[in-house]
Amino acid sequence: MSLNFVRYQHAHDFATPHEFDAAIQYGYGNWPSANARYLIGKETSIVCSPQLRDALPLRTPQDLLRATLLQHIEVPLAWQDWMEANGLDTSASRFGPGFNLYSLIIRAAVSGFGVGIVPTCLVEDELQAGTLVEPLKDRFDSPLGYYLCAPTARTNLSVYRLVAGWLEHCCNHAEGAAAPAVAEAGAGCIFCAPPHGANGANAVTTAATMAG
């Protein structure tokens, strides 16, 4: 079996003809005419550089009121929702620049320009390397995530079920566990350490054609 991945900037609604078999999309999982299977990405982290954490300093939710908050323009209420959930006055916040890619937010946070609110799966490498830290320690679940989407008719294909099972395994297997046969054949595990450019934007679609 061979897989071909193509990156699109906007989500596909599957109500119109398309040239791919399935897509990995970021959102609420409710796209028209699509069968959506959740993969990863709901776990969310608040991140910044260690230098910014120590300089402000950042230790409590209230401390974020004096930090520049980096925003995703296609998830515009992320910070507001978090602040309201933590009893903070959003009118006192310093909402900073907006970006259309999580990868840009991550790079800005690493460079010390502000604090980002991002899917944890996208910053695992930076957290491990110490270029980003979680100043508040606590993570939380977002209603948004990455989903494998396809027209319902395609989901009955054996090749689709194989790829769906592989992706779900990649997103859930414990560190060091063996990936299934499709990965051993050379496809790799695209979600164990997701490349920022491949799935770092709210509306980005990573579409795949499958040949078996």
Walk through the language-model features, giving the residues of each:
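A local structural motif
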Residues: 1-4, 87-96
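Central regulatory/effector-binding core of bacterial HTH transcription factors
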Residues: 1-31, 181-195, 209-212
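Alpha-to-beta junction loops
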Residues: 18-23, 44, 109-115
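Ligand-binding "clamshell"
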Residues: 31-36, 40, 126-136
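Flexible hinge/capping segments at coil-to-helix
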Residues: 32-69
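Secondary-structure junction motif
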Residues: 69-86
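Hydrophobic hinge/microswitch elements
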Residues: 91-134, 141-142, 156
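C-terminal effector-binding regulatory domain of bacterial HTH transcription factors
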Residues: 121-125, 129, 139-212
